[in-house]
């Protein structure tokens, strides 16, 4: 773990770069008040930042080393432990011009603070016990949330809903360990069989709880990162029109000329609370245009990566050579086949298409001209994400790979523990497996995680958070 010293005072700009109404500079550390006092001067000359009352807003001016006024600003001191990092924190709110915010940052650096690493404020909150590791990761999930459902899930994690489940399971595991170790330490009481029976019942219960949590991973991941959705079809089948319809804006150029979309477009859409990362691919066909060829190759690769495939076929015409290429590409896959242009006379032999296209596909008819079938498509997407097993963004979700892997490993140790009990092996061997499960669950909250993993997690944060 990177170690810059526990008494370091750090500073960073906490608002996005560029122009805005307000810019926020955040300072954290034992000497944050001293650093801020050297550049923030309030109207009362005998009042300095280190003497501010905690959580009170004070008006003043930013001055440089020569006494020149840089800007008018507000300053808020939040003294330890009642702050985000549980350290002394000072936030300066200036006008949001890029130059003035950068100048205030430079003054803080000149007066004893150092530049914060990415995520270092939240990392300090974790190290100081303000948040556990799962809650810390949810901070970035809140920042990146694209739908209300995503935000509710992230906010629930920040409040500790997910962590509480993990901690409860770890507590139950400790009870099992205590009973088993008691039977080891006090063999004269002849409680070995009772301890094993109790351990077996509790371990099965915990294992089932982990299995339930893992069943939410796909939904949680999608709410966090978005459902990668590839729109596939031949040129001029209506892919860009569908993209614009789902986005509810004209993002993609729509013409009657095949090959208008020569590269893939990526956009996010909110479909019933589900964030869709929609990829409008180039129409798949043979072409002499090198740029379009690259686009077609990318389209084919997106079919392999996508969480959901929307395959478009034009009902107003017979299957073409380009359609045949789409059919071959999609063999054995699953997704939704959209029969487009159903506002026109149907020429396509749909039964023939269903026979040719082998895979798990739901067939739906749509028209982007009159929006026929669009609501049904959106509901189908939502149903696929939630699978009818959970209420939308309610309860606890596993939403990242690190958490899922730790749960899977803990589950494996619990399975080994049950096998050890069934083989009637000594309690010492049972304790080894169940303690390993306890440690794996601790990696989720950060109680037993390696320092390198902590560094890697917080390096993904933005500077200033």
Describe each region flagged by the PLM:
Residues 274-277, 282-286, 291-294:
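Noncatalytic alpha-helical scaffolds and linker/capping helices
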């Amino acid at each position: 773990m990177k170690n810059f010293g526990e008494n370091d005072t750090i500073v960073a700009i906490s608002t996005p770069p560029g122009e805005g109404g307000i810019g926020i500079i955040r300072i954290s550390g034992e000497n944050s008040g001293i650093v801020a006092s050297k550049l923030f001067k309030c109207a009362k000359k005998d009042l300095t930042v280190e003497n501010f009352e905690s959580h009170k807003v004070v008006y003043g001016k930013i001055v440089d080393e020569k006494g020149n006024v840089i800007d008018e600003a507000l300053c808020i001191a939040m003294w330890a432990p009642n702050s985000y990092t549980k350290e002394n924190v000072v936030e300066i709110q200036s006008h949001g011009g890029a130059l003035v915010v950068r100048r205030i940052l430079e003054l803080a650096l000149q007066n004893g603070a150092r530049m914060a690493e990415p995520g270092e404020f939240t990392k300090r909150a974790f190290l100081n016990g303000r948040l556990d590791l799962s809650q810390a990761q949810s901070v970035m999930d809140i920042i990146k949330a694209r739908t209300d459902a995503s935000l509710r899930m992230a906010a629930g994690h920040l409040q500790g809903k997910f962590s509480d489940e993990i901690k409860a399971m770890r507590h139950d595991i400790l009870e099992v360990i205590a009973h088993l170790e008691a039977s080891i330490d006090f063999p004269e009481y002849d409680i070995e069989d009772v301890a094993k029976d109790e351990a077996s019942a509790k371990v099965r219960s915990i294992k089932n709880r982990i299995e339930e949590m893992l069943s939410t991973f796909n939904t949680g991941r999608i709410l966090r990162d978005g459902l990668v959705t590839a729109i596939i079809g031949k040129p001029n089948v209506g892919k860009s029109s569908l993209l614009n319809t789902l986005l509810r804006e004209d993002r993609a150029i729509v013409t009657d000329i095949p090959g208008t979309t020569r590269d893939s477009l990526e956009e996010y859409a909110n479909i019933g609370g589900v964030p869709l990362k929609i990829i409008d691919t180039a129409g798949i066909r043979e072409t002499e245009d090198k740029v379009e060829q690259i686009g077609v190759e990318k389209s084919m690769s997106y079919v392999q990566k996508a969480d959901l495939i929307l395959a478009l076929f034009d009902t107003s015409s017979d299957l073409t050579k380009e359609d045949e290429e789409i059919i071959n590409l999609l063999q054995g896959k699953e997704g939704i086949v959209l029969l487009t242009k159903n506002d026109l006379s149907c020429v396509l032999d749909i039964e023939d298409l269903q026979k040719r296209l082998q895979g798990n596909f739901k067939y739906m008819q749509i028209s982007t001209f009159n929006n026929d079938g669009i609501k049904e498509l959106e509901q189908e997407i939502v149903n696929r994400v939630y699978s009818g097993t959970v209420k939308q963004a309610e309860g606890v979700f596993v939403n990242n790979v690190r958490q899922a892997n730790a749960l899977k490993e803990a589950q494996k140790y619990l399975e080994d523990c049950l096998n050890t009990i069934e083989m009637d092996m000594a309690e010492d061997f049972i304790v080894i497996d169940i303690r390993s499960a306890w440690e794996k669950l601790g990696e989720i909250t950060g109680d037993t995680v390696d320092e390198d993993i902590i560094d890697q997690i917080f390096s993904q944060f933005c500077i200033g958070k």
